[in-house]
């Protein structure tokens, strides 16, 4: 107890402790995610899988003889149900559009029969040459719905899409990337420990004052 009092009696000890605790939690979380993915690979649940676009259920899309897809309404969808025991971290494909694609997104559900919702969707990262990569959150998945484009009203879009790859090797994190935060995560690691330290400091200043009263 005296050692703790001595430590926290030092100037800047509280925020330093908060940052060290946040760093420790981040490292443990990264190690957990690394272990979880390694186990899924060993069990054969996290594997690279290549599928044709027509392996997905097409809604509002018509397949053509030349392998292209043409939209027939303003809300084209590609649905993959019964994701089951698969662990899907990323989805990637290459697409070219004859027409304005506008918004692209991927919806997911976590329970069978669950409705698709804007709260459960991700947007792609374009890496050039028409390639798009979607990174899914670490959660159980029941179904996926890819919205490959969003045509303007009364307009059609024809798209040429390569095969769709689940968990392409070059889209999954390397060992060290499990411990490197994104820009947003880095911002949170800077902000929240500081806020926590400030809150504890304010509470510590208020509680002794109440006792004296």
Residues of each region from the PLM?
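Solvent-exposed strand-loop boundary residues in beta-sheet-rich modules
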Residues: 110-114, 152, 165, 170
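Short beta-strand-plus-loop segments that form exposed binding edges in beta-rich domains
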Residues: 145-155
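Extracellular beta-strand elements of beta-rich domains used
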Residues: 144, 161-164
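N-terminal Lys/Arg-rich, disordered targeting/topogenic segments
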Residues: 1-9, 211-213
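Glycan-recognition and processing domains
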Residues: 5-85, 163-187
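Extracellular ligand-binding interfaces
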Residues: 57-58, 62-135
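Short, conserved beta-strand segments of beta-strand-rich sandwich/propeller modules, principally
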Residues: 90, 141-145
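Juxtamembrane interface at the cytosolic side of transmembrane helices
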Residues: 195-213
């Amino acid at each position: 107890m005296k050692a703790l009092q001595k430590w926290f009696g030092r100037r800047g000890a509280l925020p330093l402790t908060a940052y060290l605790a946040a760093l420790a939690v981040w490292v443990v979380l990264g190690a957990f995610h690394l272990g979880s993915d390694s186990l899924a690979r060993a069990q054969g649940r996290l594997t690279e899988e290549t599928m044709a676009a027509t392996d997905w259920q097409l809604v509002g899309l018509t397949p053509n003889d030349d392998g292209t897809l043409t939209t027939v309404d303003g809300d084209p969808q590609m649905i993959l149900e019964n994701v089951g025991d698969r662990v899907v971290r990323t989805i990637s494909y290459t697409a070219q559009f004859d027409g304005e694609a506008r918004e692209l997104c991927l919806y997911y559900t976590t329970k069978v029969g669950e409705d698709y919702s804007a709260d459960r969707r991700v947007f792609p990262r374009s890496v050039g040459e028409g390639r798009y990569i979607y990174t899914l959150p670490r959660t159980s998945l029941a179904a996926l719905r890819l919205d490959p484009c969003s045509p303007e009203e009364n307009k059609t879009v024809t798209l040429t899409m390569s095969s769709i790859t689940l968990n392409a090797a070059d889209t999954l994190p390397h060992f060290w990337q499990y411990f490197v935060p994104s820009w947003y995560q880095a911002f949170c690691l800077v902000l929240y420990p500081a806020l926590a330290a400030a809150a504890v400091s304010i509470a510590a200043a208020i509680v002794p004052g109440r006792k004296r009263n």
